[in-house]
Structures are given as C-alpha cells and as structure tokens.
Amino acid sequence: MPHRPIGVMDVGGSHVTAALLGPSGAVAERRDARLDSGAPRERLLEQLLAPARELARPGLSWAIALPGPFDYPAGVGTFAGVGKFQSIAGVDLRFAVSAALGTSAADVHFVNDAIAYGIGEWTADVERATRFVCITLGTGVGSSFLDRGMPVESGEEVPPHGWAFLIEVDGQPLERSVSTAAIVAAYRRAAGQSRQVREIAAAASAGDPVAESVFVRAMETLGAAIAPYLSRFSTDELVIGGGMARSWSLLEVPLRAGLSREYRHLADLRIRPALLGDEAPLIGAADWVTRTTGN
C-alpha cells in the first residue's frame, strides 16, 4: 500500500478515471469522465488528463493503468491493431502527464490495465495467494498471472506476454468464443434474435435453455483453454472479473467443468468473482508502483 498519497488513473477505450489514494490504499477522491479514443491528439490528451487535473497537487506521484500495445517503461504506445488511441501513438505520455499535472517525469509510472486490475484483486483477499490468476471478461479477455503480487509475463507457464487473449481455440482467438460480442453472436445464431449480454444473462437466470446453453458453452470453453496454463503456473487462486462476472451464478459451474475436463486437480481450485469492481485497477496500479519504486 502507498506510504504517502498517490494519484492513479485508469484509462479505457471510452472512459478515464482519476483518483487519489491515501496511505491506507483506499480511494479517497475520484473523478470520472467519458473519453473519445478516436479524437484528434490535442482533444484526446485534454480529455485524458482533465479528471487528473482536478486532483493534481505538487509532488504527487502518478500511477497510470492503460491498455497496450504500450511500452510501459518508456511511456509511449503504438496501440497497433486496437483501433483506439491512434492520435497519441508515439506520443511521450510521461512528458505530457508530467507537464499537465505539475509533477516530475520520474514520478509518472505506467502499468498494463489488466495487470493493475489483477493486482488490485490480489490485495483484496487477506490471504493473498502466492500464485494468483485474474481473468477479466468483457469486450475482450484480459489476464494477469501474479507471483506474490508481481506480474509474470514470460515463460512456458503463462501465455505469451501473460495475455490470455492470445490463446487459440480451434485455430481462432479465445475472444471469438468468450467475450460480450461472442456471447451475443452465439445467442443470435441459436435463438434467431439479437439481445445484449445482460438480457441474455437475465434470460438464462430465468431458465431460458438457449440462453443458458450459450453461457455454459462459453465458460466451458474458457475453462478448457486456460486450464493448461493454470496447471503449469501452479495456480492457488483464480479470480474472474470484468462486466460478465456480474453473472457469476451462471459462470462458476461450467467454468469449473471446463477447467477439470483434462486437469482433474483443478476441480478443487479456489475460484471467486472479483470483489473491487472498477476500483481494482486504481488500487492495483498504486500497489504496483509502491512496491516497484519503494515510495
């Protein structure tokens, strides 16, 4: 947890949140704003930094969680292939943040948003599992593999870069089977009508067999896809976060079935839904910076 107040930001494709965390690690103040990730450079930077400007104070360190592709040590992103943030590709964001918020460039730090989310969830459990995996389900599939709260991004025990979305299922990216778009598409094929994920989840909870089968298939697929990595990683705890985790009652049983299909020992793996909601990446970014810099 921070030894002194720290500023944090969580940047998404359509939103930005800035917050101040106190020495206890709890969110003391926060500001939220909409973000147009396709805006021209100057307007995008203004939108990006506006919430943080309201909280800025001299000498404050900032931890910023945002998606890649991004060179986090350098503070520069390419954002290749994501269709977002193209106007600030190649921009030195460390300098931009430093200048806008009146702090030293050395006090501006960047971390992957999925890693920040996972670290936040890792801190939420008093037991703090040694080998911890967090999978976030929403428009995509995010992931973090943590060893004592620090990210593991290479080696045979994790997917390339620690990114679960690079796992393939039948030659296709995992997100083609497990994401909000995948759920919507699968339901449309099976039921012949379009519904949003929350509507499909409500229908499944009410006993709609078509809606239920869509969730079962997706979660069994997810479990089977990540099981080899959870086994190699000697995972102690798995957390499922993101928007789809709100439908936990629909997810847990088929997820466990998929995990243990070929890896029987994973049937007893500790699994839980995320606890912190949208505060997870804020708390995680602060914790990561505090432990990596000693501040």
Predicted ranges, named:
Residues 14, 67-70, 138-140, 244-245:
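Short glycine-rich anion-binding loops that position phosphate/pyrophosphate groups of nucleotides
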Residues 19-21, 30-31, 38-42, 88-89, ...:
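Glycine/GP-enriched mid-protein hinge/lid loop-to-helix segment characteristic of carbohydrate kinases
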Residues 1-2, 6, 86, 101, ...:
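Nucleotide/phosphate-binding catalytic cleft detector across ATP-hydrolyzing
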Residues 41-46, 58-61, 70-131, 249-262:
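Glycine-rich phosphate-binding loop and adjoining helix at the ATP-binding site
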Residues 6-10, 61-63, 131-136, 142, ...:
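Short glycine-aspartate micro-motif
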Residues 21, 109-111, 115-122, 246, ...:
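Glycine-rich phosphate-binding/hydrolytic loop that grips phosphoryl groups
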Residues 2-66:
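Conserved phosphate-binding loops in N-terminal lobes of ATP-dependent enzymes
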Residues 31-58, 173, 182-239, 244-252, ...:
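Adenine-nucleotide phosphate-binding core of ATP-dependent small-molecule kinases
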